[in-house]
């Protein structure tokens, strides 16, 4: 049960009654107001801004928003679940709910189990989440890891919310960087044959990770291509290097427990059985009057990618909010990267997705407008594109920057970080800051067993609540703690203020899940879990000094059973939230 949507519906019903009396317009949009937690807990359990939102429409029947708020509050006060509804300030409504209402919510949470928090109505949209899509030119670095974790957690969240989700990786296996990769692999191939290659020439990939590719090529081809012209071996080495790099990337992703259903090759856009899909996408836009031959004006004050003082094939991206029309072909007649991206996104639209989510590095921020323009044009406005930009990760150890990796050549690999601190620490910390904010990741801090380490703090909360049932089995061996018994618990016995705070945080979980899914912001789950863990640890500490507050109170078995039911629900919520983030929920931590 989402108590916020529940009371939104109840207030909407009150407003419909006022509409029926002729004092509000019949066409009033009842989705515009919100019901949310109040800014201060002392103000109640819910806050609604309906009277403020409809202040204009309320005149002349209501001289000001407060008058409308008073009428809504009076109607709410008659609701059997409302203890108090009062008007604050110019017209905000604060609502306090009866304990019995929260008792029913806890009962529903017990019934729903791991489904608690899942939106009640199944979503119909098909969503494509494309994430990672790192160039297959080397191992993944920590920046790639942030996008990988973000995309995977977002896909988990959307699937939990009922959307049809596809997890996709776009392999950038065409273009100049892949030729550079092939030439770098040829150098390592010659090295594997016994040549001394010395310093890696400028412009080639320097990392040791290509040595295994070179060795495989040497084993497969001997010295056939040692001194031959690049035209003879370039395609062979290109394919071998891409296969080797993608195998490495898949291993890196597996270390983070990340999988994709679809790996889509850029090369396939021009080499598939369907013919040249890039040409087809351009023709599609041309047929709609959105492609023309023309000249771009010179850039004003800033460089514009692909600008050349010549007649070019251009997409009318300015018709869809972009700053300048975009070239689709280079001077040598080959397609621009943007043209390939247009064709790729057209395949997503053709596959029936209504929402496309692209997870990119922040350095691609300047590319968002043109891609959004392309999706609008290709789908005629039917498909939504949401580009989520992931900011940099600053890798630290004890406050000092981490040195570069010899294996990668010029960066720290993701695998090195996962191997050092573990997958749970990497995943949680990558999500414990909003994706568009720079993240400082301290390798020393994330393995500390302290409240300053968020992943430990949340996992320890789960381990603590699971330990309560082990303690109950020892202290009260004849107490039935089965789920069936917990469902008979009397929640009206939970009268302590600390218990009430825990219950109210639990009640927010469905709202947090729904909001995070709709906003495409999985960090909200991490923040919520930290808040719940913090309240749990605080309540646990109070119980050390006040035995009657402990979850197991041997003198009151009925109260203990109610508290165990609360503990069970907390364990479910913590485990469910951690699962959405792709983080384990340990039952014990030593």
Curated annotation (Swiss-Prot):
Location(s), subcellular: Cytoplasm
Enzyme category, top tier: ligase
GO molecular function, one term: ATP binding
EC numbers: 6.1.1.19
Domain of life where this protein originates: Bacteria
Record's keyword annotation contains Cytoplasm: yes
InterPro entries: aa-tRNA-synth_I_CS, Arg-tRNA-ligase, Arg-tRNA-synth_N, Arg-tRNA-synth_N_sf, ArgRS_core, DALR_anticod-bd, Rossmann-like_a/b/a_fold, tRNAsynth_Ia_anticodon-bd
Catalytic activity reported: tRNA(Arg) + L-arginine + ATP = L-arginyl-tRNA(Arg) + AMP + diphosphate
Protein's UniProt keywords contain Protein biosynthesis: yes
SMART domains reported in the protein's UniProt record: Arg_tRNA_synt_N (SM01016), DALR_1 (SM00836)
One Gene Ontology term, aspect cellular component: cytoplasm
Motif ('HIGH' region): 134-144
Gene Ontology terms: biological process: arginyl-tRNA aminoacylation
Keywords (A to Z) from UniProt: Aminoacyl-tRNA synthetase, ATP-binding, Cytoplasm, Ligase, Nucleotide-binding, Protein biosynthesis
Pfam families in UniProt: Arg_tRNA_synt_N, DALR_1, tRNA-synt_1d
Subunit description: Monomer.
NCBIfam families: argS
Family in the record: Belongs to the class-I aminoacyl-tRNA synthetase family.
Protein name: Arginine--tRNA ligase
Species annotation: Beijerinckia indica subsp. indica (strain ATCC 9039 / DSM 1715 / NCIMB 8712)
């Amino acid at each position: 049960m989402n108590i916020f949507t529940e009371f939104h519906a109840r207030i909407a019903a009150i407003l419909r009654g006022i509409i029926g009396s002729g004092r509000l317009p019949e066409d009033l949009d009842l989705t515009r107001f919100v019901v949310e937690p109040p800014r201060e807990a002392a103000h109640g359990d819910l806050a609604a801004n309906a009277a403020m939102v409809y202040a204009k429409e309320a005149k002349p029947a209501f001289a000001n928003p407060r008058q409308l708020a008073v009428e809504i509050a009076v109607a709410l006060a008659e609701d059997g679940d409302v203890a108090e509804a009062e008007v604050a300030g110019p017209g905000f409504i604060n609502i306090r709910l009866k304990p019995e209402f929260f008792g029913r919510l806890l009962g529903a949470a017990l019934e729903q189990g791991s489904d608690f928090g899942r939106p009640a109505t199944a979503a119909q949209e098909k969503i494509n989440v494309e994430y990672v899509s790192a160039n297959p030119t080397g191992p993944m670095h920590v920046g790639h890891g942030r996008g990988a974790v973000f995309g995977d957690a977002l896909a988990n969240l959307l699937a939990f919310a009922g959307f049809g989700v596809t997890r996709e990786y776009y392999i950038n296996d065409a273009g100049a960087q892949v030729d550079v990769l092939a030439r770098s692999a040829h150098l390592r191939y010659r090295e594997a044959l016994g040549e001394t290659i010395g310093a890696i020439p400028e412009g080639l990939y320097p990392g040791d990770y290509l040595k295994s590719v070179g060795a495989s090529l040497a084993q497969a081809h001997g010295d056939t291509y040692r001194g031959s012209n690049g035209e003879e071996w370039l395609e062979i080495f290109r394919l071998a290097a891409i296969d080797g790099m993608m195998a490495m990337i898949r291993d890196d992703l597996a270390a983070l427990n990340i999988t994709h259903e679809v790996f889509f090759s850029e090369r396939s856009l021009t080499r598939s059985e369907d013919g040249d899909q890039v040409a087809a996408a351009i023709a599609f836009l041309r047929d709609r009057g959105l492609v023309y031959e023309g000249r771009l004006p010179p850039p004003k004050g800033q460089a514009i990618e692909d600008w050349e003082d010549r007649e070019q094939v251009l997409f009318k991206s300015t018709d869809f909010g972009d700053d300048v029309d975009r070239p689709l072909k280079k001077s040598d007649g080959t397609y621009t990267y943007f043209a390939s991206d247009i064709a790729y996104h057209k395949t997503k639209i053709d596959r029936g997705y209504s929402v496309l989510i692209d997870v990119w590095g922040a350095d691609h921020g300047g590319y968002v407008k043109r891609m959004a323009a392309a999706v609008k044009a290709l789908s005629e406005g039917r498909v939504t594109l949401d580009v989520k930009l992931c900011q940099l990760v600053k890798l630290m150890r004890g406050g000092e920057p981490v040195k570069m990796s010899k294996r990668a050549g010029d960066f720290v690999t993701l695998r090195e970080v996962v191997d050092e601190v573990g997958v749970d620490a990497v995943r949680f910390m990558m999500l414990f800051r909003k994706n568009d904010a720079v993240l400082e990741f301290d390798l020393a801090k994330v393995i500390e067993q302290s409240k300053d380490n968020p992943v430990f703090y949340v996992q320890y909360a789960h381990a603590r609540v699971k330990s309560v049932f082990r303690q109950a089995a020892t202290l009260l061996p004849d107490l039935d703690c089965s789920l069936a018994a917990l469902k008979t618990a009397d929640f009206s016995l939970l009268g302590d203020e600390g218990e009430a705070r825990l219950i109210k945080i639990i009640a927010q979980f469905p709202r947090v899940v729904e909001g995070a899914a709709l906003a495409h912001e999985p960090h909200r789950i991490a923040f919520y879990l930290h808040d719940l863990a913090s309240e749990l640890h605080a309540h646990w500490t109070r119980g050390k000094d006040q035995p009657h507050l402990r979850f197991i109170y041997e003198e009151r078995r009925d109260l203990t059973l109610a508290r165990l039911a609360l503990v069970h629900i907390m364990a479910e919520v913590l485990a469910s939230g951690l699962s959405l983030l792709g983080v384990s929920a340990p039952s014990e931590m030593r």
